[in-house]
């Protein structure tokens, strides 16, 4: 069963269930089928089946098979999307480990179970709609190089939730007690590198704000020339530049270690918008501090990307519809405006003379 048009429109405007750095991968309209079912008050089972006549190896990151508290489905109640309180992960598509993939023979299925109350507040109880659609990246054979992406959409699952029981489900993300700009436990060497990354990001964001105000390259990266939209884009960049201006004050907390268990090989950083938290993974420190040409990520690029997610800096926060220039410029105008990497790419382009 496909989603109702109203639910699809709602999701398109407010969230993307699963998102990947596809980088202009060939798109396939079939090959994987996904069915959702309820197995408890707030627990969901997802069964993914290989409907093709050949073996398929798909990336588990940001799918139902991701062990981290990433978005696995979208949830709606009374015509509104329920806020997601988990994390958004930014990973390096060029350095994916074999463990990040799952292989299915033709006709084979695999299932994953998860509790949607771990990353969303369902204590209001009542009827909820649960659904997901998007693209799942795939690799050939036992390789780790992404070669395509398969489009999928699930059934729309109706769940009648007991709010009192849902409220007892422990959140996947622990509450943060202290609030400081850079975590004081961040070692001196890493703190210095991160401080420089914030300074680089401040420069990117300031130049991007000025460029957006002037309308430079907006049509290329955001598919718009509208003055009001340009002003909104500029204001987001201004807010990011201000946030980057201090390593001891601000609305977000930046961690140098994986405090919330969102890192694994290939993941660069992640953001928890509900708690205004950004975390760098080991792969972040392997990136070049500064890139002077092109659109490849450096430390400042990643900071801009993550800060666009943070609603405490500028609301609404962005989603991860796509990564990489080739895929980002293929998004719809609405998705461009709400996609984190479009902002990083834009900031890099106007700053590096792209």
UniProtKB/Swiss-Prot annotation:
One CC-aspect GO term: extracellular region
Cofactor requirements of the protein: Zn(2+)
Keyword Metal-binding: yes
Signal peptide coordinates: 1-19
Pfam families, A to Z: Peptidase_M35
InterPro entries: Fungal_M35_metalloproteases, Lys_MEP, MetalloPept_cat_dom_sf, Peptidase_M35
Major location (coarse): secreted
Disulfide bonds: 186-256, 263-281
Location in the cell: Secreted
Binding site for Zn(2+): 305, 309, 320
Propeptide: 20-179
Molecular function in Gene Ontology: metal ion binding; metalloendopeptidase activity
Gene Ontology biological-process annotations: proteolysis
Keyword Membrane assigned: no
Active site per database record: 306
Function: Secreted metalloproteinase that allows assimilation of proteinaceous substrates. Shows high activities on basic nuclear substrates such as histone and protamine. May be involved in virulence.
PANTHER family, per the entry: NEUTRAL PROTEASE 2-RELATED, PTHR37016
Family named by the database record: Belongs to the peptidase M35 family.
Name listed for the protein in its UniProt record: Neutral protease 2 homolog MEP3
Gene: MEP3
């Amino acid at each position: 069963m496909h989603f109702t048009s109203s639910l699809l429109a709602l999701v398109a405007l407010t969230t993307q269930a699963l998102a990947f750095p596809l980088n202009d991968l060939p798109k396939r309209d079939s090959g994987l089928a996904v069915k959702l079912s309820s197995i408890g008050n707030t627990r969901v089972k997802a069964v993914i089946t290989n409907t093709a006549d050949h073996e398929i190896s798909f990336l588990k990151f940001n799918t139902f098979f991701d062990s981290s508290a990433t978005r696995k489905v979208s949830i709606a109640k009374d015509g509104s999307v329920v806020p997601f309180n988990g994390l958004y992960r930014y990973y390096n598509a060029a350095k994916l480990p074999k463990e990040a993939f799952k292989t299915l023979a033709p006709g084979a299925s695999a299932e994953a179970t998860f509790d949607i109350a771990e990353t969303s507040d369902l204590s209001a109880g009542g009827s909820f709609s649960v659904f997901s659609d998007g693209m799942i990246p795939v690799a050939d054979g036992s390789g780790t190089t992404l070669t395509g992406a398969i489009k999928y959409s699930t059934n729309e699952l109706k769940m009648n939730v007991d709010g009192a029981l849902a409220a007892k489900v422990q959140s996947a993300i622990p509450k943060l007690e202290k609030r400081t700009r850079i975590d004081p436990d961040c070692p001196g060497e890493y703190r210095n590198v991160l401080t420089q990354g914030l300074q680089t990001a401040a420069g990117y964001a300031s130049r991007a704000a000025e460029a957006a105000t002037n309308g430079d390259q907006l049509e290329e990266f955001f598919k718009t020339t509208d003055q009001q939209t340009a002003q909104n884009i500029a204001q987001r960049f201004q807010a990011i530049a201000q946030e980057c201006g201090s390593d001891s004050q601000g609305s977000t907390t930046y961690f140098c270690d994986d405090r919330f268990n969102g890192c694994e090989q290939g993941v660069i950083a992640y953001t928890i918008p509900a708690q205004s938290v950004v975390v760098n993974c080991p792969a972040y420190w392997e990136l070049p501090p500064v890139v002077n040409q092109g659109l490849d990520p450096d430390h400042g690029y990643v900071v801009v990307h993550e800060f666009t997610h943070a609603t405490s800096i500028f609301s609404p926060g962005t989603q991860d519809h796509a990564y990489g220039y080739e895929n980002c410029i293929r998004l719809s105008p609405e998705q461009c405006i709400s996609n984190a990497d479009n902002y990083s790419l834009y900031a890099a382009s106007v700053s590096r003379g792209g």
